[in-house]
A protein has these predicted regions:
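Short, conserved DNA-binding cores of transcription-related domains
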Residues: 1-18
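Catalytic center-proximal scaffold of phosphoryl-transfer enzymes
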Residues: 14-19, 24-432
Length: 432
């Protein structure tokens, strides 16, 4: 018979106090399972963290539950347990993204609204089968996304990568010439913006493109792969490095169409059927890539996108797919890539569920704690680490579970096998 014992446990420690011959005072140490400066034991703290971050229990309900069990705790104490003195967790979370980028050939990304202090904000999850990292920011843009990828660094660099980016973005030649002269490295945003001001570069477009290039240049200099694939739903801010698009998002406009006649329904369903037939063929190619199949699949894609129906809306979807041809067929070059972005959708779903239950964040510490524990929880899930055991290990300071960044690197090295039949790395392309 299995059972669960839930009851409060009150412990009072009496510590011996001695005075030495030279007048110094010696106090007996606390037991190893007592957390310094805390009125609450490690099991209770782990339970609170697990209920709030893993089970999505709100603070009022969690407080009521603890009171019903006889735990003497106030709303303020509960809030402090959830948000304060979490620096070890924050540091471990900050190491996840750099470790993941170090061993990954691709990442999946998405974003969603995440209000903070009554103002609009956004949460961007980045991850793959090895890790997940959530970052909440006040804006969503390509500049913001590059800043997230560059973390924990804060510097900018003008190098060949930056120069190539500016050329692809058609940045004015005069602006490029001014930027290529003088310092090439800048410690932080303040130093970079001061440099732009000194050069007289103040137009919004020029500042934005120049900053994106300098961020991208520093990102590659810090060791991020130039051929790293960013798999997204097609949002423009994610079109950096090598971009791949999600097939489910590409087909979704057709799934949402409401036909006005049987003929329209037949036309829509026919196109959808051919899209999913091609999807299944690409999925089979991914499992067993053969170079001889590549031109055949490309020809089928081109024929599909060249179809025209009596519905302009359907034709528009096909034209949009044709415009994203390289992104949708990226799997032909990189068979390790997923064809959809469901993993990021799942990350967002969990974050949205938490936000709908508990509301938006009100303090900087609360926002940071939500990002950190969401990242740690999802990464534990990816790595097969029991989140309850992880919390126990970290709160008690046992050190039995290695740092998650270490586990990511170990798992990444174990999985690092060149994909069969893969084409040589493609040249990074930030815009179409």
């Amino acid at each position: 018979m299995q059972d669960l014992v839930l009851r409060p446990k009150l412990t009072s420690d009496r510590r011996e106090r001695w005075q030495t011959a030279d007048g110094q005072t010696r106090i007996a140490p606390l037991p190893s399972d007592v957390l310094p400066g805390s009125h609450f034991g490690p099991d209770l703290i782990c339970f609170i963290l697990h209920q709030y971050h893993h089970q999505h229990v709100t603070q009022p309900l969690l407080l009521e539950q603890l009171h019903q069990w006889g735990i003497a705790i106030s709303a303020g104490q509960l809030s402090r347990i959830l948000t304060e003195n979490k620096e070890p967790f924050h540091q471990e979370k900050e190491a996840l993204l750099s470790a993941g980028l170090e061993v990954s050939t691709y990442v999946q990304v998405d974003d969603t609204g995440a209000r903070h202090q009554g103002q609009n904000g956004y949460c961007t999850p980045i991850g793959n089968d090895l890790f997940a990292s959530f970052e909440s920011t006040d804006s969503k843009s390509r500049l913001n996304f590059l800043e997230i990828l560059r973390r924990p660094h804060t510097d900018y660099a003008i190098n060949e990568v930056a120069l190539a980016y500016w050329q692809r973005q058609n940045l004015a030649t005069g602006v490029q010439e001014r930027l290529s002269q003088g310092p090439a490295e800048f410690a932080d945003r303040s130093a970079w913006e001061a440099h732009l001001q000194a050069l007289g570069i103040t137009a919004e477009r020029h500042v934005r493109i120049a900053s994106e290039g300098a961020l991208l240049g520093r990102l590659i200099a810090h060791g991020v792969r130039a051929d790293l694939v960013i798999l997204s739903d097609g949002a423009a801010q994610f079109e950096v490095l090598v971009h791949a698009s999600c097939w489910i998002h590409a087909e979704r406009p057709l799934a949402r169409m409401v036909p006005s006649s049987d003929a329209h329904r037949t036309a829509i369903e026919g196109v959808r059927q051919r899209i999913w037939e091609l999807y299944r063929n690409l999925k089979a190619y991914r499992q067993n890539p053969q170079a001889s199949q590549t031109p055949l699949l490309e020809a089928r894609f081109d024929a599909l996108c060249a179809e025209r129906t009596a519905l302009p809306s359907v034709n528009g979807v096909l034209q949009e797919m044709a415009a994203h041809r390289a992104d949708l067929l990226r799997v032909l070059e990189r068979p390790e890539l997923p064809l959809h972005n469901n993993l990021s959708e799942g990350h967002l779903r969990d974050d949205v569920k938490k936000r709908k239950i508990s509301g938006s964040t009100r303090s900087a510490s609360g926002r940071r704690a939500r990002d950190s524990f969401a990242s740690l929880k999802q990464t534990c899930r990816r790595l097969g680490v029991n989140f309850w055991a992880y919390l126990q290990d970290r709160v008690r300071g046992l050190g039995q579970i290695p740092a998650l960044a270490t586990l990511i690197r170990q798992r990444g090295e174990a999985l690092r096998v060149e994909p069969a039949g893969a084409a040589p790395p493609v040249t990074p392309a930030v815009v179409r």
